[in-house]
Amino acid sequence: MEPEPHSSEAVPTAAALFAWGANSYGQLGLGHKEDVLSAQQLSDFCKSGCIKRITGGGGHSAVVTDEGSLFVCGLNKDGQLGLGHTEEVLYFTPCKSLLGCAIQQVACGWDFTIILTENGQVLSCGSNSFGQLGVPHGPRRCVIPQAIELLREKVVSIAAGLRHALAATASGTVFQWGTGLASSGRRLCPGQTLPLFLTAKEPSTVTGLENSQAVCVLAGSDHSASLTDAGELYVWGSNKHGQLASQAAFLLLPQRIEARCFQNEKIAAVWSGWTHLVAQTVTGKVFTWGRADYGQLGRTVETREGWESEKQDPSLPGSGPQKGTPSCLPCLTGATEISCGSEHNLAVIGGVCHSWGWNEHGMCGDGTEADVWAPKPVPGLRFFLGLHVGCGAGHSLALCQLPALPALGQHPSVTSPSPDATKEARSQEAMEQERNQKERHAETSPQAQSDRFRNGGLVAETLE
């Protein structure tokens, strides 16, 4: 039987990159430097469907394609884009110095970038003021990615914090470099000798992990973390906001967070903001802990003596677990993608992109600048299928599937989010609209800024 006219298959579905949030340096890749409060689609800078990794730093962004190409944009005053110059770049641009070198992962720090190739080599570019490039006698900055020669073993994971970086090798060893944690360590541990890895400007082995095998490393503004092949999480550094789930103010050496904190389940993945962490167990449960005053944890928290009071959303009922105690967030169970910015988060749940946390520059994408206290769908993306998400310090990026181009006589189609997720998205949107109307008539007090400074949409902890 011959096919009916116009019954040919639809053109394969396409994907597009969306960006929103702080944009003072063009880090959204939209060609301008105005903050964006709602998700905006980027013009094609590569085949969007082949993007495999999205991330950002203090004021720059990086995208890695399936073919291993690296595209960058945004702030570049220290050469953190690796383009051979220090001019700002308003559109995603290929890093030509790495052409022919397949990239596996990129980690963006405040003003530097760490790059991992598919063969396990690590390169760095940008500011080296705190030894964060891993080249102890190198220049103050580097505008072209250079290999970190002291990392001779194959590396499988990298991370970049505010002023320090980490790498995990194929054998499970963790290295750290950059002096970003040293100041807090000296202040909070007077009279104690800091381990070399907290003060080194070249890769130094993190002691205390000899009996474990790391598969992933993470970095916050003033802390570090490592996930092992046994599903255990080790943390060290500053515990100012309870992000280490410890009673200590500062951990000089790695300490394992007890399994009971995660309902005795093994951890499959971990993400870190500057002062909070998010972990997902092997069964898909998601736990959050750490700083909570901008809604970073997606839940209410109790405060305790020794930690400064955390602002809470008065519209959310009751008080929840302490912020330094990992607590399960049921609405995130089964999330397929999660990313942490400095103090906001993105997640893909049931195919729908969600956001929550700090929103001063619109990085939650809800069209406002009011902090978001619980995960909710990003309005402009709620009917697209979320594929990948990535955060910078104060901006957001998401790769979403677009509707398929229909054959003649057919209606557009797209692989839709699950029905339950779509229903939840609409319900949450309606509740949020009602809540926003109430908030417009409510008086709000200014947020405390005593230990923070803000610059063009960027946020940094003041390191004393």
Swiss-Prot record:
What residue range is the signal peptide? none
Q: What is this protein called?
A: Secretion-regulating guanine nucleotide exchange factor
The ranges of region (Disordered) come to 301-323, 411-464
Localization of this protein: Cytoplasm; Nucleus
State a GO cellular component annotated for this protein: cytoplasm
RCC1 repeat start-end pairs: 14-66, 68-118, 119-170, 172-229, 230-282, 283-349, 350-401
Basic and acidic residues bias: start-end ranges = 301-313, 421-443
BP GO terms, sorted? negative regulation of protein secretion
- Subunit structure, briefly? Interacts with SEC5. The interaction occurs only in the presence of magnesium or manganese and is stimulated by dCTP or GTP.
InterPro entries (alphabetical): RCC1/BLIP-II, Reg_chr_condens, Ub_ligase/GEF_domain
Organism expressing this protein natively = Bos taurus
Q: Which gene encodes it?
A: SERGEF
Q: Cross-referenced Pfam families, in alphabetical order?
A: WD40_RLD
The alphabetical list of record keywords is: Cytoplasm, Guanine-nucleotide releasing factor, Nucleus, Phosphoprotein, Repeat
Q: Where, by residue number, does the polypeptide cross the bilayer?
A: none
Phosphoserine is carried by which residues?
427
In Gene Ontology terms, what is one molecular function of this protein?
Answer: guanyl-nucleotide exchange factor activity
Mind giving the lineage of the organism this protein is from?
Eukaryota, Metazoa, Chordata, Craniata, Vertebrata
